[in-house]
C-alpha cells in the first residue's frame, strides 16, 4: 500500500505527504487525515463524496505540529495537547 499522497498548495505546487492515519468523526461528519509533510504533522478534515472521491477544503486544516509534538492551530496558537492520539481521540 502506498501511504503517500499529493497535496496541491495554493500556488499549485505539489507537496508529498505521508499518511499516518485516518479517523472518522460521526460528530462532525468528516474523516480526519493525519499526514507528515516535511517536518510537520498535519491533520486535514476531508468529506467523502463517493467511494472514489474525497473533498478536501484547505480551510479545514485542523492541527499543525512539528515532529516534537508541539501542536498549533492554524493561527499558530499552541494547543493544550502534546500527543497525536489525544487529538484524534477528541474527534
Where do the language-model regions lie?
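Short, charged/polar N-terminal "headpieces" of proteins
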Residues: 1-32
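Intrinsically disordered, low-complexity N-terminal regions enriched in serine/proline/glycine
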Residues: 3, 17, 27-29, 43, ...
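Intrinsic disorder/low-complexity segments, especially N-terminal tails and targeting/processing regions
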Residues: 7, 43, 48-51, 85, ...
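Surface-exposed beta-strand edges and flanking loops
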Residues: 7-9, 21, 36-37, 48, ...
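Acidic, low-complexity, intrinsically disordered interaction modules
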Residues: 24-28, 37-58, 62
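Mixed-charge, Lys/Arg-enriched low-complexity segments
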Residues: 54-91
Amino acid at each position: 500500500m502506498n501511504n503517500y499522497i499529493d497535496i496541491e498548495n495554493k500556488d499549485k505546487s505539489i507537496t508529498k505527504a505521508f499518511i499516518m492515519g485516518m479517523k472518522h468523526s460521526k460528530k462532525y461528519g468528516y474523516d480526519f487525515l493525519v499526514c507528515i509533510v516535511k517536518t510537520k504533522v498535519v491533520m486535514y478534515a476531508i468529506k467523502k463524496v463517493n467511494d472514489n472521491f474525497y473533498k478536501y477544503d484547505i480551510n479545514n486544516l485542523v492541527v499543525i505540529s512539528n515532529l516534537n509534538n508541539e501542536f498549533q492551530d492554524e493561527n499558530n496558537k499552541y494547543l493544550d495537547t502534546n500527543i497525536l492520539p489525544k487529538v484524534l481521540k477528541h474527534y
